[in-house]
């Protein structure tokens, strides 16, 4: 029976051969919890097994603090205190405030091809860039996973996005995925695994692949996946954990829904307020005055993203009307950017460089916008109130557009900068 990669992963996890549409109880390889969703998950876990219960496998549970870091309220501080105690009692790995954004920590240190992974956060789908099936679940479901190490799933159908052509300068994975979201809509891939394929994707580095998989949820996807290849293995080796196991891949005659995209001549894409699928070419919004620019998040806070922005900002100054916030996605990414002089470039330009965390992306910690203000952000969502006032506006862009915009104080096409 011909199978997609997704069907193969669920077959392995459930111990039987399965097809899309079947309901299965599957064993979980890794579970991720963070400071916002973990408290409710722990509450559910204790309701299932009791206050003295132990998680099913302490080696498979990873905790990190990233949303409210450093603690921005007494409530957040108390949550952190409770979570530290839970992690210590359970013997689970807790990165605390020292690792960065949970999703970036996971791909750097834990995710392997072929794994079935759940996280109590919707952008867990990012891990699929390494050939895993990773999906976000609610805190109650996570409580069950912590207790039992398994969860029921409907095996998703797969939609394959075949990306062809040649990318223009300053057009990246962010632009590809925004274009695809605009094409199919916010519910165009509901409960489907979004498989990114084609010669353009094959040539993309891991950072761009992570960006694309991260945003699969923005078109309703259950997961975002790039089938594992040489780039996957090179990334894992660079992270200090070379992979020599089996590389599961889709059979050639497996069934997919197919979507084609030719990126030849495509300009940088922008998700305009207030929907991620409200996607336009940058030429339609050029000149829009901006108050804040955010370069970071699990979507675009990696070294490669920071380098793109730094190359544009080098020797320049942030416009007088703009606040530029830069946040590396992890401490590993921060150290590399620091070593190679990128942080100095940002500081010299007038940016606020913050410690690795979610920052303005989730709108609950710092870097919020006021009513009537406009934010240009490399993050993944632009819903009303996402970064502060519900009367503010958010435009989602790639790092080059963000950097150019910070310099000129209005949405700017980086291809026009000399």
Curated annotation (Swiss-Prot):
CDD domains: IPMI (cd01583)
Cited Gene3D superfamilies: Aconitase, domain 3 (3.30.499.10)
InterPro entries according to UniProt: Acnase/IPM_dHydase_lsu_aba_1/3, Acoase/IPM_deHydtase_lsu_aba, Aconitase_4Fe-4S_BS, Aconitase_4Fe-4S_dom, HAcnase/IPMdehydase_lsu_prok, Homoacnase/IPMdehydase_lsu, IPM_dehydratase_rel_enz, IPMI_cat
Transferase is among the record's keywords: no
Catalysed reaction, written as an equation: (2R,3S)-3-isopropylmalate = (2S)-2-isopropylmalate
Disulfide pattern: none
Function: Catalyzes the isomerization between 2-isopropylmalate and 3-isopropylmalate, via the formation of 2-isopropylmaleate.
Protein name: 3-isopropylmalate dehydratase large subunit 1
